[in-house]
Amino acid sequence: MMRIKKVALAFALVLVVVPATAAPGLAEAESAPLYLALGDSWAHGQGAADPATSGYVPQLYRALREDLDCIPAVVEEAADGCKQLQLVSLGRPATAALPGVTAPAVRDEQLPMALSLLERNHDANPANDVEVITLHVGGNDVAGPIQAACIGGFGAECIGTFIAEMTALQADLAFVVGTLRAAAGPDTPIVLGTYDNPVPFCDLAGIPGAIQLGALILEGTPDGTLPGVHDIVRAVAAAYDAEVAEVFGRLDAAGDWVGGSDCLHPTDSGYDEVTEAFEEALAH
């Protein structure tokens, strides 16, 4: 049924090491409904004690198995849950061979496999559909260039870089989400993730203006003249009938973040909050 397209060998190796309970073999997944997760190191669960169990993707997967009505039930008692649901998780962390995932990286590495899996949504068997798609990407696209241009002050170079990076992100993210929507069909839930600001809880907090810049990159200016990552995510979601998991402001304790030299990743308690945001988005 599926014609799995080749992806980069290094990316394939990342997939192989995902535990079978989280990401089944493709032969097993062919006949079962799927939750398909794409994205960056947040989607992978980096920073969690065990990304395969306490990242937000596996947590959401367990919740969906309990709560998602994925197949019309013959009797009412069978209507609750989706016990057959399988997880295919394509998110990955940065590695020595592969930098952090951006929207173009999702396009090149993850989208080909996602499209192959989504072919099942148009076959004659409704029991093997991709039932839910989540995507978490955008932070790596813009944070580095904007931090480099703006940490010394909010001048012309900073503003120009900010606008250019956000414009590129919007185009790249729209391509990925639009392609997923076209392949999945109009009724498949797609949820895009947002982030929270880790800077108050890591080594960058001591740099004047760094905390404010971290928030600006994510949320943009209050008057909307400079859109942030989350403004882009919300606009793209609205354009393609997707939901948004609103994470910003939820991870408000030091224990929610790895901290120190890691100015990116949540801990288990942080991923608990992210999971709740995705659950709320899917409940809309």
Model-derived segments and their meaning:
Residues 2-27:
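Secretory targeting and sorting signals
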Residues 28-40:
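N-terminal segment immediately downstream of the Sec signal-peptide cleavage site
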Residues 31-34, 71-72, 127-133, 184-191, ...:
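Loop/turn elements at helix/coil->beta-strand transitions in domains of secreted/extracellular proteins
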Residues 38-41, 77-82, 90-94, 135-139, ...:
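Active-site-proximal beta-strand/loop segments in catalytic clefts of secreted hydrolases
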Residues 48-158, 162-164:
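Conserved SGNH/GDSL esterase-like catalytic core that processes O-acyl groups on lipids
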Residues 61-69, 119, 138, 174-186, ...:
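Sec-exported extracytoplasmic/periplasmic mature domains
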Residues 111, 173-177, 230:
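Generic structural signal for well-ordered alpha-helices
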Residues 195-284:
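Catalytic His-Asp segment of secreted/periplasmic serine-dependent ester chemistry enzymes
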